[in-house]
Amino acid sequence: MNITKIKERQKRIRNFSIIAHIDHGKSTLADRILEITGTIDKRVMQTQILDSMDLERERGITIKLNAVQILYQAQNKQQYIMHLIDTPGHVDFSYEVSRSLAACEGAILVIDAAQGIQSQTLANVYLAIENNLTIIPVLNKVDLPSADVPRVKGEIKDILNIDPEMAISASGKTGAGVIDILERIVTQISPPKGDPEAPLQALIFDSYFDPYKGVVPSIRIINGTVKKGDQILFMAGKHVYEVVEVGVYNPKQISKDYLAPGDVGYLTAAIKSINHVSVGDTITSNHKPAIQPLPGYKKMNSVVFCGLYPIEINKYEALKEALEKLKLSDSSLVFEPESSSALGLGFRTGFLGLLHMEIIQERISREFGVEVITTAPSVIYHVYNLKGEKILVDNPSKLPSPQMIERIEEPFIKATIICPEIYIGKVMELSQNKRGSLQNIEYIDQQRTKINYLLPFSETIYNYFDKLKSLTKGYASFDYEMENYRVSKLQKMDILLNGEVVDALSLIVHKDFAYSRGKTICETLKSFIPKQMFEIPIQAALGKKIIARETIKAMRKDVTAKLYGGDVTRKKKLLEKQKKGKKKMKTLGKVDLPQKAFLAILSAK
């Protein structure tokens, strides 16, 4: 290995991310960059090339971060090695963005020239500033008839405090402005620092499981070099392996002789144990280890919890394996075994938000062939008992009895909503109905406003975002950050079917909303549970007190149909016998809850 050559090459490396609000055309712009630089042959080019999951292409969103190496011949006749790390735009996946930015020196901030700055644009800019990145603003979709470049440039100056003249006008659709972006990357983003002669320090920013190669970590080399045959040490767990292969993504894997400072790539070391590789860990040399690991990432804590149960009981182990493999690249996913009398064995699983929960559920189904039932999502409550001890409760069934509770605190969020001025009233009404308190209203320009609300997190995890979108005809954007815990009047509500508590349907509700919530759930269940041969009462209860009830009438079989003539005593006898049979059936009968009923309850709230 020629150290002088490595240092020369390092001066020509540029690492950058593309960050944007969801739907601002980030993946399309990435496609054009790959196409114009010849990284991907036009014949194999497909839309959203970096969105490797079918799920990402179908939904038109980026879920996972992806890395790719680009070779670019600049106008100064030098060839530059660029590493583009694509990032998601949805609020639930902001941890993926922070992981990407930790592996970069610069960020391209994509702003839709028609929609302007949205809430997630702001959040991403703050993340980039936190990571001391050079920000290159790009106005995308300038070819649209609705594009308003002067207005959006004004927003860049007023809201982001970035010189609007620095913004590049571009179109991911036509490829206009892409060369300007690449030239700006060359001149403005600094090459990576790092000493190739220092002990190896490589940051793991992603990983996945390959059935042939084992666990494959994606890494960014900070210091030192790594090549085939090296003995490496994972600093968190002190596990030692021998490197089998190193390489880069193009976007498929391409094997290389070595990786040096600034390189973004992968390594394989026949790692069979999933638990040995964790995102944010540092890989170093076993013979000449680094003194301390890299700072890694801010740990993302799960904020939404629900039960995941396999529909087929014998798929429990398959579900466990699926969750373990998904956790490899998704360190925010947490799970522990739990059991339910209604649903059997499953897992209590933690997520970063409802979209995150939905995506994991869909990936388990598609990638591992396991169909699951999800219970109602819940947040973490702080419950204080009479001794003043704090208990963390993420499952309503774990809530102590009311006599043992001194107070319950729930998490609140600071929500930022950007919407057209004409929808302020509707947004405020929705937020007030969700127990929100208005903090601030700021006018961005003549048309748009930024509204800050303090909201209970439990009220927003159901359908707040969907309702916000429909009330504002899709124009509102929503972002949030966790605020603090506050005391609330909360208690557990049980749902009873045929007199039996269904633990999977229990939830923690605010006392003022208990009746309406209970009534809605009972009505929803009534329309989804099929009729039986016996009557089924559906009840919502706070402790021993029933607050709402619906009844599913029994199916009626005409037992007198075979009678001819008018023998009324025979008729009465048969009806009496049927009545006794139904009574017995009711005491022994078990009511099965269809998955549709669970899903309907989630959307009904």
Swiss-Prot record:
Keywords: Cell membrane, GTP-binding, Hydrolase, Membrane, Nucleotide-binding, Protein biosynthesis
Gene Ontology terms describing biological process: positive regulation of translation
Disulfide bridge map: none
Annotated membrane topology: Peripheral membrane protein
Domain tr-type G: 11-193
One of the record's GO cellular component terms: plasma membrane
Localization terms from the record: Cell membrane
Pfam families: EFG_C, GTP_EFTU, GTP_EFTU_D2, LepA_C
Residues forming coiled coils: none
Catalytic reactions of this protein: GTP + H2O = GDP + phosphate + H(+)
Known function: Required for accurate and efficient protein synthesis under certain stress conditions. May act as a fidelity factor of the translation reaction, by catalyzing a one-codon backward translocation of tRNAs on improperly translocated ribosomes. Back-translocation proceeds from a post-translocation (POST) complex to a pre-translocation (PRE) complex, thus giving elongation factor G a second chance to translocate the tRNAs correctly. Binds to ribosomes in a GTP-dependent manner.
Family as reported in the entry's similarity comment: Belongs to the TRAFAC class translation factor GTPase superfamily. Classic translation factor GTPase family. LepA subfamily.
PANTHER family documented for this protein: TRANSLATION FACTOR GUF1 HOMOLOG, CHLOROPLASTIC, TRANSLATION FACTOR GUF1-RELATED
Listed name of the protein: Elongation factor 4
Source species taxonomy: Bacteria, Bacillati, Mycoplasmatota, Mollicutes, Acholeplasmatales
